[in-house]
Amino acid sequence: MKADIHPKYAEVQVTCSCGNTFETRSTLGKPALHVEVCAACHPFYTGKQKIVDTAGRVERFRQKYGNVQRLG
């Protein structure tokens, strides 16, 4: 095997947007990692459905394309 070709494998502190933190090991190269979802708040693991508010996006779409008439 070739020497010194593998990245360093170090401990990383992972912080979720829900506030949950845990340590793992990674080749990331940074001491901290921020994620949006983790096992503590992901709907698959919690059994609760997370509702994503897309009303603003839908309203913008309707304002932009609401006056378009169908062709044909």
UniProtKB/Swiss-Prot annotation:
Cofactor field:
Zn(2+)
Q: Which UniProt keywords apply?
A: Metal-binding, Ribonucleoprotein, Ribosomal protein, RNA-binding, rRNA-binding, Zinc
Tell me the Pfam families matching this sequence: Ribosomal_L31
Q: What's an example of a GO molecular-function annotation for this chain?
A: metal ion binding
Q: Which family does it belong to?
A: Belongs to the bacterial ribosomal protein bL31 family. Type A subfamily.
The UniProt note on the cofactor reads as follows: Binds 1 zinc ion per subunit.
Q: Check the record and name the HAMAP family matching this protein.
A: Ribosomal_bL31_1
Q: Does the keyword Iron belong to this entry?
A: no
GO cellular component terms attached to this protein's record: ribonucleoprotein complex; ribosome
Q: How does it assemble?
A: Part of the 50S ribosomal subunit.
Name it: Large ribosomal subunit protein bL31
Primary role: Binds the 23S rRNA.
Metal-binding found in the keyword field: yes
Residue positions binding Zn(2+):
16, 18, 38, 41
SUPFAM superfamilies xrefs: L28p-like (SSF143800)
**What does the organism's lineage look like at the top?**
Bacteria, Pseudomonadati, Pseudomonadota, Betaproteobacteria, Rhodocyclales
Q: InterPro entries, per this entry?
A: Ribosomal_bL28/bL31-like_sf, Ribosomal_bL31, Ribosomal_bL31_A, Ribosomal_bL31_sf
Q: Which organism is it from?
A: Aromatoleum aromaticum (strain DSM 19018 / LMG 30748 / EbN1) (Azoarcus sp. (strain EbN1))
The GO biological-process annotations, alphabetized, read as: translation
